[in-house]
């Protein structure tokens, strides 16, 4: 049974990878997208939340947690769905993306929906200085391949999945401390290499626990909550 499950997951992962490549190369025109009353304009070259399930799954989890009054950082914001969901739910939101088109799209979409989101061009946490946040949300790339351009950065995490090493290495410096300990929410497909990702988290003092699972086409989207590991 476990072998069949593993084979099925590998097949789903391969299909999702092919679908991602199709989406990157064949969606050549900007288009709009609606999610629970939010309207987003998604330009060419920016991750489209309507073509994948992950963003909607994580946005729903953000809303479910009711982050009223929390400071939220959206890492790799794309067209801004997670940022807009958090802002509408009452959070103070900062969004970052290395893709300048994504930065512009998130800023424009926030304004068009009457929401306030601070948007910063940044490779992960690089341009945030010593700022800390109560909640970090991320829909990361997770396929093992070096991205060829900004569009592929939304999908490919480096040949050795180095994205996750960089993310966890810097995460602790940007989570709130004191009475309001910061945490992160990350959405991943069940087909990704959780061994590598969890090992990177552990190396940098974090633990990952499943908070929700949502069955979608070609498998499951899993939302993980990430906290600082407690001493044994």
What feature does the model see in each segment?
Residues 47, 71, 95, 185-186:
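A generic structural signal for short
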Residues 1-8, 45-52, 104-120, 137-143, ...:
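Charged, low-complexity, helix/coiled-coil-prone segments
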Residues 20-85, 105, 218-231:
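SAM-dependent Rossmann-like transferase core, predominantly class I methyltransferases
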Residues 55, 59-138, 144-146:
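Conserved SAM/SAH cofactor-binding pocket of Class I
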Residues 98-100, 118-229:
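S-adenosylmethionine
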Residues 1-32:
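N-terminal auxiliary segments of SAM/dcSAM-dependent transferases
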Residues 35, 67, 112-114, 179, ...:
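Short, well-ordered coil/turn elements that cap or connect secondary structure elements
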């Amino acid at each position: 049974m476990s072998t069949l499950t593993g084979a099925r997951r590998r097949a789903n992962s391969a299909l999702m990878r092919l679908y991602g490549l199709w989406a990157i190369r064949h969606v050549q025109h900007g288009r709009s997208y609606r999610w629970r009353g939010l309207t987003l304009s998604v330009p060419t070259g920016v991750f489209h939340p309507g073509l994948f399930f992950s963003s909607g799954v994580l946005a729903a989890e953000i809303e479910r947690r009711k982050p009223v009054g929390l400071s939220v950082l959206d890492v790799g914001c794309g067209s801004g769905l997670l940022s807009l969901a958090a802002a509408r739910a009452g959070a103070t939101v900062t969004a970052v993306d290395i893709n300048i088109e994504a930065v512009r799209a998130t800023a424009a979409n926030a304004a068009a929906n009457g929401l306030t989101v601070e948007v910063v061009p940044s490779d992960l946490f690089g341009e945030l200085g010593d700022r800390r946040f109560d909640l970090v949300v991320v829909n990361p790339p997770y396929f093992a391949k070096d991205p060829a351009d900004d569009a592929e950065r939304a999908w490919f995490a480096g040949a050795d999945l180095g994205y996750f090493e960089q993310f966890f290495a810097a995460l602790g410096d940007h989570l709130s401390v004191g009475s309001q300990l910061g945490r992160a929410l990350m959405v991943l497909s069940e087909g990704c290499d959780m061994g590598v990702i969890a090992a990177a988290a552990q190396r940098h003092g974090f633990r990952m626990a499943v908070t929700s699972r949502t069955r979608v086409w070609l498998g499951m989207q899993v939302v993980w909550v990430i906290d600082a590991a407690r001493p044994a």
